[in-house]
Curated annotation (Swiss-Prot):
Alphabetized NCBIfam families for the sequence: clpP, PRK00277.1, PRK12553.1
Keyword Transit peptide (UniProt): no
Alphabetical list of PROSITE patterns matching this protein: CLP_PROTEASE_HIS
Top-level division of the source organism's lineage: Bacteria
Annotated family: Belongs to the peptidase S14 family.
InterPro entries, per database record: ClpP, ClpP/crotonase-like_dom_sf, ClpP/TepA, ClpP_His_AS
Subcellular location: Cytoplasm
Protein name: ATP-dependent Clp protease proteolytic subunit
Organism: Actinobacillus pleuropneumoniae serotype 7 (strain AP76)
Sample GO molecular function, one term: ATP-dependent peptidase activity
Record EC number: 3.4.21.92
Function: Cleaves peptides in various proteins in a process that requires ATP hydrolysis. Has a chymotrypsin-like activity. Plays a major role in the degradation of misfolded proteins.
Amino acid sequence: MALVPIVVEQTSKGERSYDIYSRLLKERIIFLTGQVEDHMANLIVAQMLFLEAEDPEKDIYLYINSPGGVVTAGLAIYDTMNFIKPDVATLCTGQACSMGAFLLSGGAKGKRFALPNARVMIHQPLGGARGQATDIQIQAQEILKLKEMLTRKMAEHSGQPFEKVAADTERDNFMSAVEAMEYGLIDKVLTHRDIK
Protein backbone atom coordinates (compact mmCIF):
# COMPACT_ATOMS: atom_id res chain seq x y z
CA MET A 1 0.00 0.00 0.00
CA ALA A 2 1.33 3.42 -0.96
CA LEU A 3 1.95 5.99 1.73
CA VAL A 4 -0.08 9.18 1.47
CA PRO A 5 1.53 12.33 2.88
CA ILE A 6 -0.17 14.04 5.82
CA VAL A 7 -0.32 17.82 6.18
CA VAL A 8 -0.94 19.61 9.46
CA GLU A 9 -2.86 22.89 9.63
CA GLN A 10 -2.94 25.30 12.53
CA THR A 11 -6.45 26.49 13.37
CA SER A 12 -7.89 28.56 16.19
CA LYS A 13 -8.95 25.25 17.78
CA GLY A 14 -5.51 23.69 17.51
CA GLU A 15 -3.87 21.44 14.95
CA ARG A 16 -5.74 19.47 12.34
CA SER A 17 -4.13 16.85 10.11
CA TYR A 18 -5.33 15.82 6.66
CA ASP A 19 -4.09 13.39 4.08
CA ILE A 20 -2.82 15.47 1.17
CA TYR A 21 -5.73 14.56 -1.14
CA SER A 22 -8.35 15.58 1.45
CA ARG A 23 -6.56 18.88 1.96
CA LEU A 24 -6.49 19.53 -1.78
CA LEU A 25 -10.19 18.60 -2.02
CA LYS A 26 -10.85 21.58 0.27
CA GLU A 27 -9.32 23.67 -2.54
CA ARG A 28 -11.69 21.93 -5.03
CA ILE A 29 -8.87 19.87 -6.57
CA ILE A 30 -9.58 16.24 -7.50
CA PHE A 31 -6.89 13.83 -8.67
CA LEU A 32 -7.62 11.28 -11.40
CA THR A 33 -4.49 9.15 -11.35
CA GLY A 34 -3.79 5.67 -12.63
CA GLN A 35 -6.10 3.26 -14.37
CA VAL A 36 -9.69 4.45 -14.86
CA GLU A 37 -11.84 1.76 -13.25
CA ASP A 38 -15.18 1.54 -11.44
CA HIS A 39 -14.01 2.10 -7.86
CA MET A 40 -11.87 5.10 -8.80
CA ALA A 41 -14.69 6.52 -10.95
CA ASN A 42 -17.15 6.23 -8.07
CA LEU A 43 -14.76 8.12 -5.77
CA ILE A 44 -14.29 10.89 -8.33
CA VAL A 45 -18.04 11.15 -8.99
CA ALA A 46 -18.69 11.35 -5.23
CA GLN A 47 -16.07 14.11 -4.83
CA MET A 48 -17.60 16.13 -7.68
CA LEU A 49 -21.10 15.79 -6.20
CA PHE A 50 -19.78 16.81 -2.77
CA LEU A 51 -18.05 19.89 -4.17
CA GLU A 52 -21.18 20.86 -6.11
CA ALA A 53 -23.20 20.64 -2.87
CA GLU A 54 -20.58 22.77 -1.08
CA ASP A 55 -20.65 25.53 -3.71
CA PRO A 56 -22.41 25.09 -7.07
CA GLU A 57 -20.85 28.29 -8.47
CA LYS A 58 -17.12 27.59 -7.96
CA ASP A 59 -15.05 25.67 -10.48
CA ILE A 60 -13.74 22.18 -9.78
CA TYR A 61 -10.20 21.28 -10.90
CA LEU A 62 -9.61 17.74 -12.18
CA TYR A 63 -5.89 16.87 -12.38
CA ILE A 64 -5.35 13.93 -14.75
CA ASN A 65 -2.37 11.57 -14.93
CA SER A 66 -3.82 8.39 -16.40
CA PRO A 67 -3.06 5.71 -18.99
CA GLY A 68 -6.81 5.28 -19.55
CA GLY A 69 -8.96 2.35 -18.61
CA VAL A 70 -12.54 1.09 -18.59
CA VAL A 71 -14.78 3.06 -20.97
CA THR A 72 -17.95 2.81 -18.88
CA ALA A 73 -16.12 3.95 -15.73
CA GLY A 74 -14.75 6.94 -17.65
CA LEU A 75 -18.19 7.76 -19.00
CA ALA A 76 -19.55 7.86 -15.43
CA ILE A 77 -16.98 10.58 -14.68
CA TYR A 78 -17.64 12.37 -17.99
CA ASP A 79 -21.42 12.39 -17.53
CA THR A 80 -21.05 13.73 -13.99
CA MET A 81 -18.71 16.48 -15.21
CA ASN A 82 -21.47 17.59 -17.56
CA PHE A 83 -24.33 16.98 -15.10
CA ILE A 84 -23.10 19.12 -12.23
CA LYS A 85 -23.44 22.90 -12.18
CA PRO A 86 -19.81 23.94 -11.53
CA ASP A 87 -17.42 24.08 -14.47
CA VAL A 88 -14.86 21.28 -14.33
CA ALA A 89 -11.44 22.52 -15.42
CA THR A 90 -9.09 19.73 -16.52
CA LEU A 91 -5.30 19.70 -16.25
CA CYS A 92 -3.01 16.98 -17.59
CA THR A 93 0.07 16.29 -15.50
CA GLY A 94 2.21 13.48 -16.92
CA GLN A 95 -0.10 11.68 -19.31
CA ALA A 96 -3.71 11.58 -20.42
CA CYS A 97 -4.13 8.53 -22.63
CA SER A 98 -7.21 6.87 -24.05
CA MET A 99 -10.10 7.56 -21.61
CA GLY A 100 -7.79 9.98 -19.78
CA ALA A 101 -7.51 12.04 -22.99
CA PHE A 102 -11.27 11.86 -23.51
CA LEU A 103 -11.88 13.23 -20.00
CA LEU A 104 -9.20 15.89 -20.48
CA SER A 105 -10.91 17.11 -23.66
CA GLY A 106 -14.32 17.01 -21.92
CA GLY A 107 -13.42 19.76 -19.45
CA ALA A 108 -15.15 23.14 -19.58
CA LYS A 109 -14.29 25.06 -22.75
CA GLY A 110 -11.47 27.49 -22.14
CA LYS A 111 -10.48 25.58 -18.98
CA ARG A 112 -8.66 22.54 -20.42
CA PHE A 113 -4.94 22.61 -19.73
CA ALA A 114 -1.75 20.56 -19.86
CA LEU A 115 1.69 21.07 -18.40
CA PRO A 116 4.52 21.51 -20.94
CA ASN A 117 5.89 17.95 -20.84
CA ALA A 118 2.55 16.17 -20.61
CA ARG A 119 1.69 13.52 -23.20
CA VAL A 120 -1.76 12.96 -24.63
CA MET A 121 -2.75 9.83 -26.56
CA ILE A 122 -5.99 9.14 -28.38
CA HIS A 123 -7.11 5.89 -29.95
CA GLN A 124 -10.22 3.82 -30.53
CA PRO A 125 -11.66 1.82 -27.61
CA LEU A 126 -10.11 -1.55 -26.89
CA GLY A 127 -12.07 -4.68 -26.13
CA GLY A 128 -12.08 -8.41 -26.23
CA ALA A 129 -14.78 -11.02 -26.33
CA ARG A 130 -14.99 -14.72 -25.66
CA GLY A 131 -17.81 -17.17 -25.76
CA GLN A 132 -20.36 -18.20 -28.31
CA ALA A 133 -20.33 -16.58 -31.74
CA THR A 134 -23.56 -14.72 -30.98
CA ASP A 135 -22.11 -13.28 -27.77
CA ILE A 136 -18.99 -12.16 -29.62
CA GLN A 137 -21.17 -10.49 -32.24
CA ILE A 138 -23.12 -8.64 -29.53
CA GLN A 139 -19.87 -7.42 -27.93
CA ALA A 140 -18.51 -6.33 -31.33
CA GLN A 141 -21.67 -4.32 -32.05
CA GLU A 142 -21.46 -2.68 -28.63
CA ILE A 143 -17.81 -1.65 -29.02
CA LEU A 144 -18.57 -0.21 -32.47
CA LYS A 145 -21.39 1.88 -30.95
CA LEU A 146 -19.03 3.09 -28.22
CA LYS A 147 -16.34 3.89 -30.80
CA GLU A 148 -18.80 5.99 -32.82
CA MET A 149 -20.09 7.83 -29.74
CA LEU A 150 -16.60 8.54 -28.34
CA THR A 151 -15.39 9.73 -31.76
CA ARG A 152 -18.41 12.03 -32.11
CA LYS A 153 -17.87 13.52 -28.64
CA MET A 154 -14.13 14.00 -29.20
CA ALA A 155 -14.87 15.73 -32.53
CA GLU A 156 -17.32 17.98 -30.70
CA HIS A 157 -14.78 18.85 -27.97
CA SER A 158 -11.81 19.35 -30.31
CA GLY A 159 -13.59 21.10 -33.17
CA GLN A 160 -12.10 18.55 -35.59
CA PRO A 161 -14.30 16.88 -38.23
CA PHE A 162 -15.69 13.47 -37.24
CA GLU A 163 -13.86 11.80 -40.14
CA LYS A 164 -10.51 13.25 -39.05
CA VAL A 165 -10.93 12.08 -35.45
CA ALA A 166 -12.04 8.65 -36.70
CA ALA A 167 -8.90 8.38 -38.86
CA ASP A 168 -6.61 9.78 -36.15
CA THR A 169 -7.86 7.28 -33.56
CA GLU A 170 -7.42 4.16 -35.70
CA ARG A 171 -4.10 3.54 -33.94
CA ASP A 172 -2.37 5.01 -30.89
CA ASN A 173 -1.84 8.71 -31.66
CA PHE A 174 0.57 10.39 -29.23
CA MET A 175 0.76 14.18 -28.93
CA SER A 176 2.83 16.66 -27.00
CA ALA A 177 0.99 19.28 -24.97
CA VAL A 178 1.40 21.79 -27.80
CA GLU A 179 0.14 19.28 -30.38
CA ALA A 180 -2.87 18.50 -28.16
CA MET A 181 -3.61 22.22 -28.02
CA GLU A 182 -3.30 22.58 -31.79
CA TYR A 183 -5.63 19.58 -32.21
CA GLY A 184 -8.20 21.20 -29.89
CA LEU A 185 -8.08 18.67 -27.04
CA ILE A 186 -6.90 21.38 -24.63
CA ASP A 187 -7.08 25.16 -24.64
CA LYS A 188 -3.70 26.12 -23.21
CA VAL A 189 -0.31 24.76 -22.20
CA LEU A 190 0.54 26.06 -18.72
CA THR A 191 4.17 26.96 -18.15
CA HIS A 192 3.46 28.67 -14.83
CA ARG A 193 0.53 28.79 -12.43
CA ASP A 194 -2.29 31.01 -13.59
CA ILE A 195 -5.18 28.88 -12.38
CA LYS A 196 -5.94 27.94 -8.81
